[in-house]
Amino acid sequence: MGKAQPLPILITGGGRRIGLALAWHFINQKQPVIVSYRTHYPAIDGLIKAGAQCIQADFSTNDGVMAFADEVLKSTHGLRAILHNASAWMAEKLGAPLADVLACMMQIHVNTPYLLNHALERLLRGHGHAASDIIHFTDYVVERGSDKHIAYAASKAALDNMTRSFARKLAPEVKVNSIAPSLILFNEHDDAEYRQQALNKSLMKTAPGEKEVIDLVDYLLTSCFVTGRSFPLDGGRHLR
């Protein structure tokens, strides 16, 4: 008998930056992937050509989240992992209704992973001890808070807390952990002054790039023991 096809890894927000890098990492390992995307960036066409299943999703409403879950349930009988990478960034600023800012941040960072974890739970179970994973991408601000992004920080803190709750609920079949990054890579339009200011916030004074995240994700996926933990990727920023 031939070797069984590996179960797919689901990556939310996989059309750009870290999500896209993770998708290509797994594709290059012959690991099937399912990617959600909100905006059809050119990179999505490359993923589709490489064999990834890419599903456009609107996580701004609970109905949109559940519609995406239904598409995943139709497409596979199981999942190797869910990587909750989809994110949004809103600040409290003049003219923006505060209730709308909070609702938006909670919707993408709390409602979406909460609903998907429940809706797709049966796809993660039944594959053996510690055979499946959920990884939440939180943020360094969970530890420090943020005076300019209060709703964002609060929503990521809620996601961090859900890591421990889902770890309790889904063990020992499913490991649930979170990754809390600070600066990993710059945007193309970031100028030299901003880049230097950002680098100076950490002890290591570098933006390590996607590989740092990929290596940690690989560690969590291959561990048979680690669950309910948050892993900072901040270059010692908490010591500055």
Curated annotation (Swiss-Prot):
Entry annotated with the keyword RNA-binding: no
Keywords on record: NADP, One-carbon metabolism, Oxidoreductase
Active site: 152
GO biological process: one-carbon metabolic process
Listed GO MF terms: dihydrofolate reductase activity
A Pfam family: adh_short_C2
Keyword Phosphoprotein: no
Reactions catalysed, as given in the entry: (6S)-5,6,7,8-tetrahydrofolate + NADP(+) = 7,8-dihydrofolate + NADPH + H(+); 7,8-dihydromonapterin + NADPH + H(+) = 5,6,7,8-tetrahydromonapterin + NADP(+)
EC number(s) on file: 1.5.1.50, 1.5.1.3
Free-text function comment from the UniProt entry: Catalyzes the reduction of dihydromonapterin to tetrahydromonapterin. Also has lower activity with dihydrofolate.
Family, as annotated: Belongs to the short-chain dehydrogenases/reductases (SDR) family. FolM subfamily.
NCBIfam families: PRK06483.1 (NF005066)
PANTHER family per the UniProt record, alphabetical: DIHYDROMONAPTERIN REDUCTASE (PTHR43639:SF6), OXIDOREDUCTASE, SHORT-CHAIN DEHYDROGENASE/REDUCTASE FAMILY (AFU_ORTHOLOGUE AFUA_5G02870) (PTHR43639)
Name under which the protein is recorded: Dihydromonapterin reductase
Organism: Shigella boydii serotype 4 (strain Sb227)
Lineage, highest ranks first: Bacteria, Pseudomonadati, Pseudomonadota, Gammaproteobacteria, Enterobacterales
